[in-house]
């Protein structure tokens, strides 16, 4: 939940939203091209203009947020006063016959209507299982260097004002109950590092929450509350989604509980690098259903009320571009978190780039490195003591195949490695100094992220 943790948390105030914004600095293009299958959190470097330039905002109003959301300029009130016309409850045309009592007529008119569309049905069946998650932690504050100046200390003497060295960060997100004994799926960036987690149900009840585990690499976490006979969601199948089908988001944006928005699935399989978070091991669902800070961890539903994704992030300064983790991926990670409290991701230990003639020329000019090919996947760095280093992979090697399957770009390699298990042995076909070679690599476990 650190502001720069693998997935930072978006605070209440818009000007404090953490963002992934990439400049159009040509001097660093070759670094952005690198795709990492090796380290936990490679630094995002300037790149060519892409969707990520707009800035990715994680939609948990996470720890670090402060202040109160206040509605101002209530123009609706003036509109109601000046422009609204209040119609009579019963018009002349609708007066009941003499032999029918007025009370009976009014009662029939005021009776609740049946749900008029599938969204109403979905909200009624799933809404009670969507929760608000409040998290907080105590962090140490750094004293401004000026207050350590000996001159100031001599000047103020004993009247030097004490500086608080701790402060409480608070944040809000959403989640959904997946078991009637209180297991809840949410985003890792909502609860990472929290000292205290509180879960509030739609019926108003609140429970302390325990984080069973979180995985920053996929931004999935599981929270447990001690309660029974709870409403639950139905989990769908995100492997067979169709672009254009309905999408319904339920959550607590900006502290507004139980907010429902609708849209469609705009795209599937959005690669993490395409949206500005190359360290994430997820291919995202894109939707135009309105998602805002506080929606993080809430469900994205299909027309049948099944959860197909976990709402996670939006593109800042853009309309109708939100992203969700496919529920199949979230469920896979959550099962490991429930069982062991952690997740092991396959780790090769290289940084690589999809080569192009332009990039080949730029690398040669800026680094002096002579890349022998102008296409394919080139290893730019081998991490010390990594599985790749042990297998004798070298900088400048060109990856041609993995387990006999030809590879054409870095994203394909990353996807294939992500499907492997720790301990698997894989054969890599490489081109080195114009000679083809085959090397066998034993897949390791992705190292944990260092403290932020």
From Swiss-Prot:
A single GO cellular-component term on record: cell outer membrane
Deletion consequences: No effect in a single knockout, but growth is inhibited at high light (120 umol photons/m(2)/s) or at elevated temperature in a triple protease knockout mutant (hhoA, hhoB and htrA). Triple mutants are not phototactic. No effect on the PSII repair cycle, even in the triple protease knockout strain.
Any GO MF annotation of the entry: serine-type endopeptidase activity
Pfam families assigned to the protein according to its UniProt record, in alphabetical order: PDZ_2, Trypsin_2
Top-rank taxon: Bacteria
A biological process from GO: proteolysis
Subcellular location: Cell outer membrane
InterPro entries: HhoA_HhoB_HtrA-like, PDZ, PDZ_sf, Peptidase_S1_PA, Peptidase_S1_PA_chymotrypsin, Peptidase_S1C
Domain PDZ: 352-434
Disulphide bridges: none
Induction: No induction by UV-B light.
Membrane among keywords: yes
Transmembrane segments: 51-71
Keyword Lyase: no
Annotated membrane topology: Single-pass membrane protein
Gene3D superfamilies named in the record: 2.30.42.10, Trypsin-like serine proteases
Cited PANTHER family: SERINE PROTEASE FAMILY S1C HTRA-RELATED (PTHR22939), SERINE PROTEASE HTRA2, MITOCHONDRIAL (PTHR22939:SF129)
NCBIfam families cross-referenced by the UniProt entry: HhoA_HhoB_HtrA
Family indicated by similarity: Belongs to the peptidase S1C family.
Role description: A putative protease, its function overlaps that of the related putative proteases HhoA and HhoB.
Protein name as it appears in the record: Putative serine protease HtrA
Gene that encodes the chain: htrA
């Amino acid at each position: 939940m650190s502001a720069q943790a693998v997935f930072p948390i978006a605070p209440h105030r818009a000007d404090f939203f953490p963002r992934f914004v990439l400049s159009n600095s040509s001097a660093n293009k070759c670094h952005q091209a690198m795709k990492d299958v090796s380290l936990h959190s490679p630094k995002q470097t300037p790149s060519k203009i892409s969707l990520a330039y707009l800035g990715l905002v994680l939609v948990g109003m996470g720890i670090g947020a402060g202040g109160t959301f206040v509605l101002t300029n209530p123009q609706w009130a003036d509109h109601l006063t000046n422009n609204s016309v209040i119609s009579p409850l019963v018009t002349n045309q609708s007066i009941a016959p003499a032999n029918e009592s007025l009370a009976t007529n009014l009662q029939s008119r005021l009776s609740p209507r049946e749900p008029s569309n599938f969204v109403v049905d979905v909200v009624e069946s799933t809404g009670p299982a969507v929760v608000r998650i409040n998290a907080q932690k105590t962090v140490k504050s750094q004293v401004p260097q000026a207050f350590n100046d000996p001159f100031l200390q001599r000047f103020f003497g004993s009247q030097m004002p004490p500086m608080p060295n701790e402060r409480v960060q608070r944040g809000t997100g959403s989640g959904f109950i997946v078991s009637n004994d209180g297991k809840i799926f949410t985003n890792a960036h909502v609860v990472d590092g929290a000292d205290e987690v509180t879960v509030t149900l739609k019926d108003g009840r609140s429970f302390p929450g325990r984080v069973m585990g979180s995985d920053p690499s996929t931004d999935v976490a599981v929270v447990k509350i001690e309660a029974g006979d709870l409403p639950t969601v139905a989990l769908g199948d995100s492997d067979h989604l169709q672009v254009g089908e309905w999408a319904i988001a339920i959550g607590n944006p900006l502290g507004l509980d139980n907010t429902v928005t609708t849209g469609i699935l705009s795209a599937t399989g959005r690669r993490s690098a395409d949206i500005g978070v190359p360290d994430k091991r997820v291919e995202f669902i894109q939707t135009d259903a309105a998602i805002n800070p506080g929606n993080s961890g809430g469900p994205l539903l299909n027309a049948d009320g099944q959860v197909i994704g976990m709402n996670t992030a939006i593109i800042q300064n853009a309309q109708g571009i939100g992203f969700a983790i496919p529920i199949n991926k979230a469920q896979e990670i959550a099962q490991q978190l429930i069982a062991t409290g952690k997740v092991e991701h396959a780790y090769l230990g290289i940084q690589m780039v999809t080569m192009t003639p332009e990039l080949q020329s730029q690398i040669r000019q800026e680094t002096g490195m002579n890349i022998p090919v102008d296409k394919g996947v080139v290893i730019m760095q081998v991490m010390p003591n990594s599985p790749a280093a042990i297998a004798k992979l070298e900088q400048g090697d060109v990856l041609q195949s993995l387990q006999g399957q030809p590879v054409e770009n870095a994203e394909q390699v990353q996807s294939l490695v992500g499907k492997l298990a720790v301990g698997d042995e894989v054969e890599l076909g490489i081109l080195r100094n114009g000679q083809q070679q085959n090397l066998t690599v034993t897949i390791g476990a992705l190292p944990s992220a260092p403290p932020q």
